[in-house]
């Protein structure tokens, strides 16, 4: 199982868990809206259509459960994080490999079917959380954010930029 934290009201919450599905379909459970569901299927489509670029032989169906059913989850800003989590899970789950590192990063952005990372709202709150929690890197959409405020904040146009940024900043993270 692979779990990913997220931000809610300036605190971490366990956001979702991913594991291989026992069926031949991707399953989404939890208290989520249509934008979150769309983000999961966009991520899966991008991975299926570009699996060789990501070093994947196949894309396994999975069950993704959005935890904390007392908190409704929706909005496009989680798209990039969902994509990254599904990519890492697809890449490493069969090897049972966990990346143990002091390098922690936060990503935010709305991902479309071409892999572009689009502008999102609430960036002020996300920056505040990033500073408070002392992450190593914060990756935000380039669209709408021409001025970066901190040296540990970088912007991206698409999912490939995001992966390149993370690989360059974290030399000890295995290449994707």
Where do the protein language model's features map onto the residues?
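Peripheral, non-AAA+ core regions of ATP-driven protein-machinery
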Residues: 1-176
